[in-house]
Amino acid sequence: MPKFAANLSMLFTDVPFLDRFKAAADAGFTSVEYLFPYEYPAPLLAEKLRENGLKQVLFNTAPGNIAAGEWGVSALPDRIEDARRDIDNALEYALALNCPSVLVMGGVVPPGEDRDAYQQTFIDNLRYAADKFAPHGINIMIEALSAKVKPNYLFASQYQALELANLIDRPNIYIQVDFFHAQIVDGNLTQIIHDLDGRIGHIQIASVPARHEPDEGEINYPFIFAELDRVNYSGWIGCEYNPRGKTEDGLGWAEPWLEKKH
């Protein structure tokens, strides 16, 4: 049975971030994810989780300088010290939040740059991250991003992610499959589920092409959820989509799995 996590970076955005924990719990979610925790002290976030009975299941390493076009620094050859400092900081947050998985962001490869150098830097930094997190039982995620959302990101295909995971070669490295990106880049989602079986550590969902609730568009999510059950996927599924309107009004698709408070 699927386990859904509310993505607090994209859902319940009609209230301030710290109020979204209660909004998610009131809507029936028992777990949450979001992009970046670093604006807030970890103890404050941990208290928000506790007081709302929520589990933190995922967050990302820091994105770098977004205004300058960065989206992660772990693949940037001239930012190795920054990348490892971000990884160390993420570990502190993961421990404080009792979070089982962290997504290490790669980075954008500017046109004309040596992609192989960026890839090797990413591999080296991911080995560093995996080795730092492993003693604590925390998994590291890597995620492919489509050019529609992030042009020139280090890798766009789920099969590139699989190749990188194999090259990194650490037991706590897993692939985070966002079906929004996977459908745009690869398609054939059922085959991806089977080809990556055992290597998928986290999943995210949204409709394609609009990136709204997963009850519209070209992906048959009830079929996808059933297929994930068939391969005994036991991880979380993050709801990383832009609601058509008020988040609560668009959760009808998830009612069979949510634990609404009355």
From Swiss-Prot:
Catalytic activity: 2-dehydro-L-erythronate = 3-dehydro-L-erythronate; 2-dehydro-D-erythronate = 3-dehydro-D-erythronate
NCBIfam families: OxoTetrIsom
Annotated source species: Pectobacterium atrosepticum (strain SCRI 1043 / ATCC BAA-672) (Erwinia carotovora subsp. atroseptica)
GO terms of molecular function: hydroxypyruvate isomerase activity; metal ion binding
E.C. designation(s): 5.3.1.35
Magnesium keyword on record: yes
Highest taxon listed in the record's lineage: Bacteria
PANTHER family: HYDROXYPYRUVATE ISOMERASE-RELATED (PTHR43489:SF6), ISOMERASE (PTHR43489)
UniProt similarity note: Belongs to the hyi family. OtnI subfamily.
Its job: Catalyzes the isomerization of 2-oxo-tetronate to 3-oxo-tetronate.
Enzyme class name: isomerase
Protein name: 2-oxo-tetronate isomerase
Chain coiled-coil ranges: none
Gene behind this protein: otnI
